[in-house]
Structure formats: structure tokens, C-alpha cells
């Protein structure tokens, strides 16, 4: 892709060679590409990404303004795929595509686009994409360049006919039905950036210190290779540890394929001493415990570098740990999940803001967006929060007379409880006996402390 973009637009990928090699390594770890001397059967990268993704969206709910609700619904439909792409490659782009009354979204993996420019914060100022098309037995290459500018987004599109593996001659966009409606150059005023929302992992670049985002397991990539080598050694140990029969040369004979085997009746009439027949059985001792102990050390180190709590990749430690150690491990995991949830919320806000800007360009009425007001995301209780324990504490306070039951119920059912009318409504709907006992005009005490205020 890099050479094609350079030939077509005179601008190549700004990603460093070290970073490109690291991206290939992350993808190989995730997709289980075998390396010499390694066994990728464990697929630790897949396990890490799937665990994080499931936890991030375990209790996820989202709401937005009615005009953008179809677009948010389409965005939520691809949230898992987009999050996984971002965790694997460090960055994932979300491309809005006009569909009906809103927009659909297409997640773009890190190795499927080329950054042509970045600002000081790592945001894309130019990006190139490539698509291979087939028509009438011929291959075509559709190249697109997006450039951010003060006047808006500029999109340049060029179509080339492939000449084998090389970029051939340029042909008009009207050559193919799929590209006939495209324009060679298009300016979208009012559209910020490159017209693509970005999901970027919150990790600092540990590869070359550049502006590119890194995979969530990038710090643990070396340990994952060590685990793969250890798995390969363990497999070899088991294969080489099979029992072997050593027999004298005169007891072997060749079959019709040239393979040397023992005689069929060799084991029929063995005397008491096998040495008299020239046969020795050897069963080597396997080093299973040493291999497993080393593997657990590697997995625990991976958990520390990724930000997992103990027991997600490794086995739960048999030895008891102090409360401080347990709290530290779970606290790190909670922070990891919160950072990824903030990453998605920021990316979703970018996507909906982009939909509103594109809606104005396309003449779609009523599309406006304010991330602080129009987008609400509920992530549930979180990793560390124990709802049952908190409810029991509130009930204990109610029993002791330290907390009004209306406030406890308001917290449990997430009901408004700011004034007397709202508390009276809670009594009427959830505490019928108390509502009957209390006078209808009973004035609530002022200065009540709200839960969660």
C-alpha cells in the first residue's frame, strides 16, 4: 500500500519502520501466525483482547438525541469489532457511510490504512486507503487520500488498472459502475479532521516513542513469545518422552515400503530376562512441573504489564496474599477497564459529531450534536463496585434509623429524590404502608442529604 500511495499521490506512510514491524508482530500474535521454535496454540493475545472487550461492554447502555439515535444504534452494532481492532492494532478508524435516515459505520483495521500525516497529539491529518476491485476479469485499485484542512475535509480519489503486482495506468472513475458516482476531488466544508473517528488505546508508545498508538498487549509481546517458545519446548518434551524399544539389529526386518520393524511374534514368547533377546525399553522422565511453573511466572508477568488482575491469564495462586496485594491487583484492572471505556466514549463522541457535520453537508435536517449533553453512556457498577454489599450497608443504616428508607430505595432503583414531591412519589409507589400512615400534607424535612450527591 505504501508504494502505491507514493506513486499515486506523492506521499507515503509516515509510520516508522520499527512501528510497522511492531504492528505486524501484534497481528501475528493475535492471528496465531507460527514462528520458528514457537507454538502459538495458547493464543494469549486473543484471550487478553476478548477478556477486556467482554468486561468493557458487560453492562453497557447508551442514549443520544432522537435525530442521531439510528446512527448510535449502527455504531453500537460494530462496537465489539471496533474495540477489538483498536486493542490489537492500537488504533481503529470508524468510517461513516450514509444509510437511510442516519449513518452506518465501517471499522478500519490498523494495517488497512496508511497514516500520511499526524499532528502533535497523534491525530491524523492525512490518511490513505486502498481497495481492490474486479470487473470483466481485470483488476483495479481504488486509492483514496483524505486531508484535513482549515476549509474542511478534502477527499482525492484515483482509480488505477493493475498490471500484475504493479500499479498500472490511471483510468477514469467512470470506468467501473462501483466508482462512477465518485469525484476525483471533493471538499466537505465544516467537517473536521479526516472525516474518520478514531479509537486509540491510552497506552504510551513503547515501541519508538512516536505518536502512533500501540496494542494493549504491546508491553507483553516479548513475554508472549517466551510463552510460545516454552509451549513448543513442552510439546517437544512430550513427543521425545514417548517410550522407546531398543532392539538388536538382527531382530529388525524391512517391510514392503522399506521401513524397518520388529518381527510380529517378537512379544509372544519373551523369556524372564529381556536382555537375552536384545530388547530394552526406555521411558524418560518428563519435566512437567518445571515447565508449568515457568509458564505461570510468564502469565503473571503478562497480567502485570497489561493491567489484569491475578487469575485472568494465570492460575489462581494457591498461596494466600495480603489484602493490599489483592486490592492493588483489582484496582489496576479497574483502572484499565475505565480507561478503555473512556476511549470508547471519546471515539463514539467523535463519530456522532462527524455524523452531525456530514448531515449538514448532505442537507439532512435536525442533526446537531453536543458530546457533553447529547450522549449518555452507562457502564454499570464496574469491576470493584459490589452493589449487594452497598445495599446491605444502606439497609443497616435504615434499620438503625440513620437513613430514610425512601433515599435507600431511590438509590437502588435510580429514582429522582431531590425534593419532597419526589420522595412522596417513592413512598406511594414503593412503600404503600408508609404512604398510608403518613399524612398527605406531611412536609418533608429540609436539608436531607441525597445519596450520591
Predicted regions and their residues:
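Extended, charged amphipathic alpha-helical segments
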Residues: 179-328, 364-365, 375-378
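Extended, regular secondary-structure scaffolds
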Residues: 93-209
Amino acid at each position: 500500500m505504501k508504494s502505491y500511495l507514493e506513486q499515486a499521490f506523492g506521499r507515503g506512510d509516515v509510520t516508522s519502520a520499527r512501528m510497522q514491524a511492531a504492528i505486524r508482530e501484534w497481528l501475528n500474535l493475535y492471528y496465531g501466525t507460527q514462528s520458528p521454535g514457537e507454538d502459538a496454540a495458547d493464543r494469549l493475545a486473543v484471550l487478553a483482547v476478548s477478556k477486556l472487550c467482554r468486561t468493557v461492554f458487560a453492562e453497557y447502555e447508551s442514549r443520544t438525541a432522537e435525530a442521531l439515535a439510528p446512527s448510535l444504534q449502527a455504531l453500537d452494532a460494530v462496537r465489539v469489532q471496533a474495540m477489538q481492532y483498536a486493542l490489537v492494532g492500537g488504533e481503529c478508524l470508524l468510517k461513516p457511510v450514509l444509510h437511510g435516515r442516519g449513518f452506518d459505520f465501517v471499522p478500519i483495521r490498523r494495517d488497512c490504512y496508511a497514516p500520511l500525516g499526524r499532528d502533535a497529539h497523534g491525530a491524523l491529518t492525512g490518511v490513505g486507503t486502498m481497495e481492490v476491485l474486479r470487473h470483466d476479469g481485470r483488476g483495479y485499485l481504488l486509492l483514496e487520500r483524505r486531508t484535513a484542512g482549515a476549509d474542511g475535509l478534502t477527499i482525492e480519489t484515483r482509480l488505477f488498472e493493475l498490471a500484475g503486482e504493479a500499479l498500472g495506468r490511471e483510468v477514469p472513475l467512470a470506468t467501473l459502475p462501483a466508482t462512477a458516482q465518485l469525484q476525483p476531488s471533493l471538499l466537505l466544508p465544516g467537517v473536521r479532521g479526516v472525516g474518520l473517528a478514531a479509537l486509540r488505546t491510552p497506552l504510551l508508545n513503547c515501541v519508538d516513542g512516536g505518536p502512533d498508538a500501540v496494542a494493549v498487549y504491546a508491553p507483553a509481546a516479548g513475554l508472549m513469545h517466551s510463552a510460545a517458545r516454552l509451549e513448543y519446548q513442552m510439546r517437544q518434551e512430550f513427543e521425545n518422552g514417548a517410550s522407546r524399544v531398543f532392539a538388536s539389529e538382527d531382530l529388525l526386518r524391512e517391510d514392503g515400503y522399506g521401513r524397518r520393524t520388529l518381527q510380529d511374534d517378537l512379544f509372544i514368547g519373551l523369556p524372564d530376562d529381556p536382555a537375552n533377546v536384545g530388547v530394552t525399553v526406555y521411558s524418560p522422565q518428563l519435566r512437567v512441573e518445571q515447565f508449568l511453573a515457568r509458564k505461570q511466572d510468564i502469565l503473571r508477568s503478562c497480567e502485570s504489564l497489561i493491567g489484569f488482575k491475578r487469575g485472568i491469564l494465570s492460575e489462581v495462586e494457591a498461596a494466600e496474599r495480603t489484602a493490599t496485594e489483592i486490592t492493588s491487583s483489582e484496582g489496576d484492572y479497574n483502572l484499565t477497564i475505565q480507561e478503555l471505556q473512556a476511549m470508547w466514549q471519546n471515539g463514539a463522541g467523535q463519530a456522532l459529531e462527524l455524523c452531525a457535520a456530514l448531515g449538514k453537508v448532505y442537507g439532512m435536517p435536525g442533526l446537531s450534536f453536543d458530546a457533553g449533553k447529547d450522549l449518555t453512556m452507562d457502564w454499570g457498577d464496574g469491576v470493584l463496585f459490589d452493589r449487594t454489599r452497598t445495599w446491605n450497608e444502606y439497609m443497616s443504616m435504615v434499620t438503625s434509623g440513620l437513613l430514610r428508607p425512601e433515599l435507600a430505595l431511590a438509590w437502588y432503583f435510580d429514582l429522582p429524590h431531590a425534593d419532597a414531591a419526589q420522595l412522596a412519589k417513592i413512598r406511594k409507589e414503593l412503600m404503600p404502608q408508609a404512604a398510608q400512615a403518613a399524612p398527605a400534607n406531611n412536609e418533608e424535612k429540609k436539608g436531607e442529604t441525597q445519596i450520591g450527591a
